[in-house]
């Protein structure tokens, strides 16, 4: 295969390996390195550290600080590790990094009072991408799909401002001479400056180029997966085209710089593999400290020995859609029940209560399922007039529109605008939809299908007995003027709350005909048992009732839990509500910050109080799962979702410049909410705002890989791993850590990963 073809192939591979970023309104947390899960995390970290400067480890200073503050157990480190880390923290050694031609030109030229080339390249491409997504039909050719490369080329050839801004008279001619086809561009670049590059060097270069526009690449990856396009590949070609322009510009105008570029590029091509190996060896010490740090935090968890299950039936059972914030509420609810003389049992269950729904609205489906799944059923949403509140919300969600909104409404409205838009609490939405007919794509769902939904949901919840009252509790959050607010509803829910799913499943489970069919299948729900739906509003910890028949005795327990949490946080419910509705609030809530543990087991075995709010708790009883089938399903669904959430937070801490979204104060929505700029330029940002992981003085999210704990024997875990291919890849390559909880309450390593077939 020729070098040019190899470059095209490798550029295509690098493009396809970019993880998607969902639009703001459909937010789903994503592991940016999801497509690298089959490779060891240490190797991927070293490769991206060299190619793009991306950090998947904290600095030596961080680990040294944790050690000095006794946050890392002495038993987990050696004297050699301590001495080497101290030297690292003092020396501040710089690691080698690939430099694109734009950065090399900036290094070798003196551009006093002029914009740096790399900054202009990123800005120009980014602004062009924004126009492309905002007005796609303007750039379509007759009878053809939109071409990002053609769109950029058309704008660049017509824009004389770049030539003036950069004070380079050759640019117009150079743009005019660029090939019209991205594959031909690759051929030209190969012939001019990449003919001697190895596959390894081409991969490093491609990753370095795409990392300059990683946010846009992630957004286009989402689009490419849903349509027949190659926008990520075209974006990489656009970035490569700028490299070719700067190469030619140096050749025409500055012989010295041109020779320096040749020498520097040649050295990088020749040495890149050795440089990556050097970084991996250098990082090995930090990976040891990272492992010690993670284990030290994990050691704070305390588990009690396996005990006999409570013999009395619960008075109330509350099934929460799993979330680190619901863990706090579950503990408070069970304690409130005890204080009121009521036995309350809480459970954790992922995935919108197992109801794979979509709402059909205005000709399109709005999924109410985790991002990794597809809806199997849908409910048609009836037409509804838009409320004043939603109109105002739309007005003020538009970029830079708050000022025009104040002008239109008058200064008398400024106070109300700064405390939020009037209207229904977002978490109580979709009430009018839940009673609609549940349909499959060939018509209304059959009784058999509806029974199947209920049967699967109940099997996942693993009820051994039914309380008189069972509450399905979804979660959501409400705050204003936050571009990333959908991500705080849930890290995996596409911007949706659990309200609709809870309502629909409760409706089905209370249906007598469905119960009769369930009884025939061996699932006997007592006649006295009633299901209710509710919503945990995570900012105020208030529970919003979605059912109309909830007894006061049940509501009383939930009120007591909310009061308990309000007292514990030292902030009144009113103050929290005010904070969440304030337009200038940078930290309306912490979302899923500090998530670090996923526990499949009996939640009451976890006894440590100081770790509450960091754990995803999903009920699981291995006694009822001898072949590991259910555990494999849990690993393959909530297990992967938790990895995505955890790695988005992790990367927002370790690499906030590339994989975080910067300062929330400066967020500006872009192109129909495809993402945000920080200010008015640079790359589209991805990941979380700095204010979502840092409180101004310290991190509120500890940078830990997900610690998965399973309450099961080794054989059951191995059987599940053999079926959960992607989860097993994450485990084998150390993207997650896996532990087994034994009957004595001890955490044991799962020592024998199976190779997925």
Curated annotation (Swiss-Prot):
Its main location: membrane. GO terms for cellular component: plasma membrane. It is found in: Cell inner membrane. Zn(2+) binds at residues 321, 323, 475, 490. GO terms for molecular function: zinc ion binding. It is a peripheral membrane protein. Its cofactor is Zn(2+). Belongs to the inorganic carbon transporter (TC 9.A.2) DabA family. Part of an energy-coupled inorganic carbon pump. This is Probable inorganic carbon transporter subunit DabA. It comes from Idiomarina loihiensis (strain ATCC BAA-735 / DSM 15497 / L2-TR).
């Amino acid at each position: 295969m020729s070098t040019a073809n190899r470059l095209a192939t490798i550029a295509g591979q690098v493009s396809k390996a970019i993880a998607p970023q969902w639009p703001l309104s459909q937010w789903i947390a994503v592991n940016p390195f999801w497509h690298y899960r089959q490779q060891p995390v240490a190797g991927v970290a070293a490769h991206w550290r060299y190619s793009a400067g991306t950090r998947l480890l904290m600095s030596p200073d961080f680990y040294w600080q944790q050690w000095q503050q006794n946050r890392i157990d002495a038993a987990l480190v050696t004297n050699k590790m301590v001495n080497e880390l101290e030297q690292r923290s003092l020396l501040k050694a710089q690691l080698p990094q690939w430099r694109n031609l734009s950065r090399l030109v900036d290094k070798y030229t003196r551009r006093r009072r002029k914009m740096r080339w790399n900054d202009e390249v990123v800005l120009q491409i980014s602004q062009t991408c924004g126009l492309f997504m905002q007005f796609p039909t303007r750039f379509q050719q007759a009878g053809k799909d939109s071409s990002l490369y053609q769109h950029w080329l058309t704008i660049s050839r017509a824009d004389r401002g770049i030539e003036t801004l950069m004070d380079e008279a050759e640019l117009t001619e150079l743009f005019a001479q660029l090939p019209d086809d991205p594959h031909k561009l690759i051929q030209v670049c190969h012939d001019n400056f990449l003919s001697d590059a190895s596959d390894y060097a081409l991969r490093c270069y491609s990753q370095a180029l795409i990392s300059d526009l990683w946010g846009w690449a992630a957004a286009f990856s989402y689009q490419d997966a849903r349509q027949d396009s190659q926008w990520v590949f075209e974006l990489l070609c656009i970035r490569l085209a700028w490299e070719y322009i700067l190469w030619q510009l140096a050749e025409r105008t500055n012989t010295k710089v041109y020779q320096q570029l040749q020498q520097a590029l040649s050295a990088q091509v020749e040495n890149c593999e050795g440089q990556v190996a050097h970084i991996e060896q250098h990082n090995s010490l930090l990976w040891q400290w990272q492992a010690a740090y993670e284990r030290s935090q994990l050691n704070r968890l305390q588990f009690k020995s396996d005990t006999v299950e409570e013999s009395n039936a619960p008075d109330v059972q509350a099934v929460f859609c799993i979330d680190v914030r619901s863990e706090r509420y579950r503990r408070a609810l069970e304690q409130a029940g005890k204080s009121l003389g009521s036995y309350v049992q809480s459970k954790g269950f992922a995935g919108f209560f197992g109801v794979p729904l979509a709402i059909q609205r205005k000709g399109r489906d709005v999924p109410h399922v985790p991002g990794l799944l597809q809806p199997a059923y849908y409910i048609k949403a009836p037409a509804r007039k838009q409320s004043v509140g939603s109109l105002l919300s739309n007005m003020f969600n538009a970029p830079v529109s708050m000022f025009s909104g104040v002008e239109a409404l008058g200064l008398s409205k400024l106070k109300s605008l700064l405390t939020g838009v009037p209207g229904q609490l977002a978490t109580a939405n979709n009430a009018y939809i839940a009673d609609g007919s549940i349909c499959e794509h060939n018509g209304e769902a059959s009784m058999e299908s509806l029974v199947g939904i209920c049967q699967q949901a109940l099997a996942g919840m693993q009820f051994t007995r039914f309380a008189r009252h069972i509450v399905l509790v979804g979660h959501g959050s409400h705050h204003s003027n936050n571009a990333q607010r959908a991500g705080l509803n849930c890290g995996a829910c596409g911007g949706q709350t659990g309200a609709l799913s809870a309502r629909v499943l409760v409706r089905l489970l209370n249906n007598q005909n469905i119960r009769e069919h369930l009884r025939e299948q061996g699932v006997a729900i007592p006649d006295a048992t009633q299901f209710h739906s509710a919503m945990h509003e995570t900012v105020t910890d208030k529970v919003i009732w979605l059912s109309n028949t909830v007894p006061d005795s049940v509501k009383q327990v939930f009120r007591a839990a909310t009061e308990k949490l309000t007292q514990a946080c030292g902030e009144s419910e009113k103050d929290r509500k005010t904070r969440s509705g304030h337009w200038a609030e940078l930290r309306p809530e912490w979302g899923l910050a500090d998530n670090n543990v996923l526990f499949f087991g009996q939640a009451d075995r976890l006894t440590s109080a100081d770790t509450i709010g960091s754990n995803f708790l999903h009920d699981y009883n291995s006694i009822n799962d001898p072949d590991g089938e259910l555990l494999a399903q849990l690993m393959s669904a909530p297990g992967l979702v938790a990895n995505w959430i955890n790695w988005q937070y992790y990367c927002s801490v370790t690499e906030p410049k590339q994989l975080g979204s910067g300062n929330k104060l400066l967020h500006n929505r872009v192109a129909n909410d495809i993402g945000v700029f920080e200010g008015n330029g640079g790359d589209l940002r991805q990941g979380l705002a700095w204010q979502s992981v840092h409180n101004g003085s310290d991190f509120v999210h500890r940078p830990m890989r997900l610690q998965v704990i399973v309450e099961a024997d080794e054989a059951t875990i191995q059987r599940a791993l053999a079926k959960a291919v992607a989860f097993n890849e994450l485990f084998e390559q150390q993207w997650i850590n896996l532990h087994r909880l034994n009957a004595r309450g001890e955490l044991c390593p799962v020592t024998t990963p199976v190779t997925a077939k």
